[in-house]
Every structure is written in structure tokens, then in C-alpha cells.
Amino acid sequence: MMVERLITQPRHIEVQVLADQHGQVACLFERECSLQRRHQKLVEEAASPVMTDAHWQTLRESCTRLIRAAGYTGAGTVEFMYDPHTESFAFLEVNARLQVEHPVTEMITGVDLVQWQIRIAQGEALALAPALMNGDRTAILGHAIECRIVAEDPSKGFMPSIGYLRGWAAPMGPGIRFDTGFGPGREVTRYYDSLIAKLIGYGATRDEAEPLATRP
């Protein structure tokens, strides 16, 4: 029998890391992905509204030790469960890839994670701003929130829905990033995830980012 500690009202916190082949590890702050359905993330934001400087130093040090001990290189995500009652973090896993929600980290750091993943694979050394390399939270540029847009049928319990996109109007404007591979006339097939787009709202504060990410 295996017994695990129960965490009530948990929050899903993950740290974006970049590690090169020369021993350097950059922890590019955290994302919060607590809003989920059926254990699937729906809304992600950076940085987490519950993160403190003390918590961040603990997470950053833990992630750096883990990545170096594993000899990991490239882009990755270290995931934790946060217990708000004990203010403690429980390690979940390392995702050895870029996450769907990586754009919110790009927005608040100005770092192109896709580009750096390739450059690291080519043997380049990380050359980010010192504040980013050191995990200094003064380097965080505003706040970003990502909402996943999915092809699902609300009349059938939000089951994935297939078919052709008859209409498509991508949101535009300052503070908005819209990532997708779909457009009018494209087919949503049964062979892939129901995710068809990501809407990212960015602002100087969380209050500024929220209405951009949730606009109708």
C-alpha cells in the first residue's frame, strides 16, 4: 500500500528552465496552471500571483540542483504542487520539452524559448541578460495570461468535436498574441488533441492582462 499526503486546494506551479551544454542553468520564473478540467490545463499565467521572493529562491535553487544532477540540457519544465495551507511545494515531474503554455514565459521575459532550444542543441552557451540568468524577479516584464481555445461541444459535456471551421476571426490589437495553425476551411480531425489555438493577453499588471486574454 502506498500512502500520499492529501493536498486540498492545490495550485499547479511550474518553472521554465533552459540548460546549456556548458553547465549553465537559467530558471526563467514560474507559471501557474491551476485552472484545469479533467486534469487538462485550460488557463495558464506568468508569473504566479501567489509566488513570494522566498518561495522563488527555494524553487530556483531546487530546480537548478535537479537539472545539473540529471545532466539535462535544453528547454524543460519542472512541475510542482503547491500547498497553500503549509506553504510548501511537492515535486511532480520534469517535462523534457517546451510546454503548450510557453508563450506566457516568452511574454514576461522577452526570451524566444524555441530559438534557444535550437541554439542549445547546436552547442551554444546561454547568453541571456544577467538578471535572467540569476533569476532576479526584477527582470519580469509585466504579466501574461493564456487561454486555450478548444474544439469541444458544450451540449455533449464538452467532448472533443470534429469537422470544418466555417468561420474564424482571430483577435488582434496591442497586448494580444494569438498562436494557431488553423484558419477558415481547415478540418479539425479526430487524430489530434482538441486544442486549436492559444490566446495570450499581456499587460503591465495582471489586471491589465486578464481582459485581453478573456475578451469575447
Predicted regions and their residues:
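ATP-dependent carboxylate activation and anion-phosphoryl transfer catalytic cores
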Residues: 1-216
